[in-house]
Amino acid sequence: MDNIQVGIVMGSDSDWPLVQKACQTLDKFGVGYETRVISAHRTPEVAIEYSKTAEERGLKVIIAAAGGAAHLGGVLAAATVLPVIGIPVAGGALNGLDALYATVQMPSGVPVATVACGSAGPTNAALLAIQILGTADADLRKRFHDHKEELKKKVAAANEKIHSC
């Protein structure tokens, strides 16, 4: 895709299997993205440079996935005015609770929108990015509306199936 609007950054390549769900969702909606592995702790200069130059490169939203001491979203948010969506990656001794707290507990003035730990996180991060982009793109907004209608139909079908038993 030529029109890259979303930057997806993960703290480690071990996050890639989870992050692929965000990519699949963006692909479904035809939203262009780029992916990078950048560590907030091991390559902080790269993280800051990536974030500082994101807007001039045409990005509109950044998604940051990290586990453990998950400071990636905060570091990226500190260096840009673009919306940053954090995906806390489950794992380690605290099974993602540390990543959740590190992602969601940001100081005033440095917001990171945070989605769920686990498999819903990447999908919801991509959907939130699509909603943000949809505020300035009527076609994308309509496709998101259609997606929501499909979700309603699936629930109605499940209800009909269970209710008829």
Where do the language-model regions lie?
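Short, solvent-exposed amphipathic alpha-helical segments in soluble enzyme
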Residues: 21-28, 52, 79-81, 130-131
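N-terminal beta-loop-helix "entrance" segment that forms/cooperates
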Residues: 35-56
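Glycine-rich phosphate/diphosphate-binding loop of Rossmann-like nucleotide-binding domains
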Residues: 4-42
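Short glycine/serine/threonine-rich phosphate/pyrophosphate-binding segments
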Residues: 15-20, 43-47, 66-75, 94-97, ...
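C-terminal binding/interaction regions
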Residues: 4, 10-17, 21, 97-165
